[in-house]
A protein has these predicted regions:
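Conserved C-terminal helix/tail region of periplasmic/extracytoplasmic solute-binding proteins
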Residues: 217-247
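Extended ligand-binding regions for polar small-molecule ligands
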Residues: 40-45, 49, 63, 109-110, ...
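Short, well-ordered beta-strand segments
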Residues: 8, 38, 56-60, 103, ...
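Extracellular/periplasmic bilobed ligand-binding domains
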Residues: 86-122, 137
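Sec-exported extracytoplasmic/periplasmic mature domains
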Residues: 1, 5, 42, 56, ...
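Bilobed "Venus flytrap"/periplasmic-binding protein-like clamshell domains
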Residues: 13-14, 33-93, 108
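Extracytoplasmic
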Residues: 2, 21, 32-34, 52, ...
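Acidic, polar ligand-binding/catalytic clefts
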Residues: 1-50, 107-131, 244-247
Length: 247
């Protein structure tokens, strides 16, 4: 909110308090996540239903993760010992060193941090998901035009995947017979005028960074962290990614 950056795009969960209390606006969701738990294989635990009183849990202090963890254990009537740190690397190091029985954060984070463990194969992520964690870009309140530009930049990437427009074929799609595709690549209509942009602003996004699927593959799937997109698949393919049409 200090004005040092124009956009924040990281693992920040969209919540009511963050949206309403601190002068920020979430423009959309670019990753649907959920909180889970990691344990050591030799613990014999394969489900959160096996958690017992006295369990210790590592997490980040001052986060929705910490609040979700508290709510989860309280709702199950399980007494637990929180082991909280400010930095993610500190949490991972503490868990890896055996200072806690389980490590909890968003499941994407668990998958990524598991690769940093001394022996990654000694750890498993439990199947249960205990929260909804919609993650997405954030801008400061008070600049409606910039907010719209960021929102529709995200929408462009998702819609481009839906219509098969990629960084490789975007220019060729200008001659498509589909009016929606033509609008998406700036060959028809005046989609940029409302933002003070030219008509190929969304075409440049697609050519430079690709559609949503290309971005997911490059940054997540190809790393081996989460090859299965799960809810982050298009709505036409069993996921929940769905954006308003560009028209």
């Amino acid at each position: 909110t200090s004005g040092e950056i124009d956009i924040l795009s990281r693992n920040t969960t969209w919540t009511l308090s963050r949206d309403a209390d601190i002068g920020l606006t979430f423009v959309g969701v670019n990753f649907y996540d959920g909180q889970g738990f990691m344990v050591r294989k030799d613990s014999g635990i394969t489900s959160t239903s096996q958690f017992k009183n006295g369990i210790s849990a590592c997490t980040n202090i001052g986060t929705t993760t910490e609040l979700n963890m508290r709510d989860f254990f309280n709702s199950k009537g399980i007494s637990y010992t929180p082991v909280a740190f400010e930095k993610a690397d500190e949490v991972v190091a503490a868990y890896d060193a055996g200072r806690c029985d389980t490590y909890t954060t968003d499941k994407s984070g668990l998958a990524a941090q598991r690769t940093k463990m001394t022996n990654p194969d000694d750890h498993i992520v439990l199947p249960e998901t205990i929260s909804k964690e919609p993650l997405g870009p954030v801008v400061r309140q008070g600049d409606a035009v910039w907010e719209d530009i960021v929102r529709w930049s995200l929408n462009t990437m998702i819609e481009a995947e839906e219509y098969g427009v990629t960084s490789a074929n975007a220019d060729m799609m200008k001659t498509s017979e589909n009016p929606q595709i033509k609008r998406l690549v700036g060959a028809e209509g005046e989609m940029g005028a409302a933002f003070g942009l030219d008509n190929e602003w969304n075409l440049r996004i697609i050519k430079q960074v690709g559609n949503y699927g290309e971005s997911y593959k490059r940054n997540i799937a190809d790393t081996g962290i989460l090859p299965d997109r799960g809810p982050n698949e298009l709505w036409t393919k069993g996921g929940i990614l769905y954006v308003p049409p560009s028209r």
